[in-house]
């Protein structure tokens, strides 16, 4: 019993030594001293929630509207990537922060590059996720007429492939895959021009088809430039 009382007294003394205190800074801010090593501001400045948008037009409309009385503030618009834009307020030097006001993220389809798709899925992907232009139609035409049956081989020299395609109503013919092809998928904001880039078009023995990106990501820089030019 005596040892328990002694332990309780020791704990009480320890708590007294770490008594919570309110500390006032030179700027008048009050901080809570929880453990002598970490100060927590009692009434920190509250920032408005980040406004989330999906189009560049909505961002431009917001900035022009002056709904939040921002016309006289020095804002910074940052094109983070081909799918994201951020707007920051001027620096809050007192709190050491640059508050973010707006976040804009493009709503674009997820295109399964480098993944094998059957002919139907591949054709749907081309028609729904790519801009209608010459090379898209060339690939679409080839994919639509592709025919691989038992005993048929896809000839491949590492650059192009030869496959059997329907030629007319009943006859079949050998045709070379179009490669490389220049396509414009929907990958950035709809308000700006979709960058064109090169792709490798491939077929496997099961007649599945795939597109592989072949421009090293150069299109991303072009997309960022297009967004900045629009703004």
Language-model-detected regions and their locations in the chain:
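An N-terminally focused, membrane-permeabilizing/fusogenic/translocator signature enriched
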Residues: 1-86
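Alpha-helix boundary/N-cap detector
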Residues: 3, 50-54, 113-117, 121, ...
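Generic detector of well-ordered alpha-helical segments enriched in charged/polar residues
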Residues: 6, 57-60, 120-127, 140, ...
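Generic secondary-structure transition motif, activating predominantly at the C-termini of alpha-helices
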Residues: 13-17, 64-67, 130, 134, ...
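N-terminal start-of-chain detector that recognizes signal peptides
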Residues: 46-49, 153-158, 169-174
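Long, mid-chain structured domain cores
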Residues: 60-133
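Amphipathic, membrane-inserting segments
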Residues: 65-70, 78-80, 87-96, 162-231
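Membrane-inserting effector segments that mediate pore formation, membrane fusion
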Residues: 111-162
């Amino acid at each position: 019993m005596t040892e328990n009382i002694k332990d309780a007294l020791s704990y009480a003394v320890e708590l007294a030594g770490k008594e919570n205190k309110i500390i006032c800074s030179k700027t008048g801010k009050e901080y809570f001293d929880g453990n002598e090593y970490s100060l927590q501001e009692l009434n920190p400045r509250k920032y408005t929630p980040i406004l989330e948008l999906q189009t560049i037009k909505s961002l431009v409309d917001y900035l022009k509207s002056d709904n939040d009385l921002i016309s006289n503030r020095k804002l910074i618009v940052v094109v983070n990537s081909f799918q994201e834009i951020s707007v920051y307020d001027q620096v809050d030097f007192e709190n050491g922060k640059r508050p973010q006001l707006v976040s804009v993220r493009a709503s674009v389809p997820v295109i399964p590059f480098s993944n094998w798709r059957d002919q139907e899925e591949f054709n749907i992907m081309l028609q729904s996720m790519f801009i209608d232009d010459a090379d898209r139609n060339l690939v679409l035409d080839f994919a639509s007429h592709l025919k691989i049956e038992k005993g048929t081989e896809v000839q491949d020299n590492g650059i192009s492939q030869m496959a059997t395609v329907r030629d007319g109503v009943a006859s079949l013919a050998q045709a070379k895959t179009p490669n490389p092809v220049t396509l414009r998928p929907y990958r950035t904001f709809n308000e700006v021009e979709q960058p064109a880039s090169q792709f490798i078009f491939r077929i496997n023995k099961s007649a599945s088809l795939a597109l592989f990106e072949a421009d090293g990501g150069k299109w991303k820089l072009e997309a960022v430039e297009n967004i900045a030019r629009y703004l």
